[in-house]
UniProtKB/Swiss-Prot annotation:
Keywords: ATP-binding, Nucleotide-binding, Transferase, Ubl conjugation pathway. It comes from Arabidopsis thaliana. This is Ubiquitin-conjugating enzyme E2 10. Accepts the ubiquitin from the E1 complex and catalyzes its covalent attachment to other proteins. Mediates the selective degradation of short-lived and abnormal proteins. Residues 1-147 form the UBC core domain. GO terms for molecular function: ATP binding; ubiquitin conjugating enzyme activity; ubiquitin protein ligase binding; ubiquitin-protein transferase activity. Pfam families: UQ_con. The gene is UBC10. It comes from the Eukaryota. It catalyses: S-ubiquitinyl-[E1 ubiquitin-activating enzyme]-L-cysteine + [E2 ubiquitin-conjugating enzyme]-L-cysteine = [E1 ubiquitin-activating enzyme]-L-cysteine + S-ubiquitinyl-[E2 ubiquitin-conjugating enzyme]-L-cysteine.
Amino acid sequence: MASKRILKELKDLQKDPPTSCSAGPVAEDMFHWQATIMGPSESPYAGGVFLVTIHFPPDYPFKPPKVAFRTKVFHPNINSNGSICLDILKEQWSPALTISKVLLSICSLLTDPNPDDPLVPEIAHMYKTDKNKYESTARSWTQKYAMG
């Protein structure tokens, strides 16, 4: 069941890739993918290329995939291990969602952080109290870790 669904999503992604994202299996393992997300142009992550790993559980799509950043990101909803605080990867997951929709949600999270549900409270605090400092720090991390 899971592998059939994953194959279908892969075909759909190749046919109609979401803007500024790409994803596909690592080697021969259909349950382990790597994705690339381009930093959205209207965000401090612009110009960055962010690598993301995707692990599908055996009972996918009834359980959400495990998605994590491999590239370091300065963001209130992404911690230093690359974990992402995104409702659709947890309690709001639905089998109707696809990897394509997950990647687009991560892109919009980069543009619009959710400081009220932070994974990194210090960054959320900075975002709320000193947005310029947040944006310049996020930009410098992007240049340091996500470019070249």
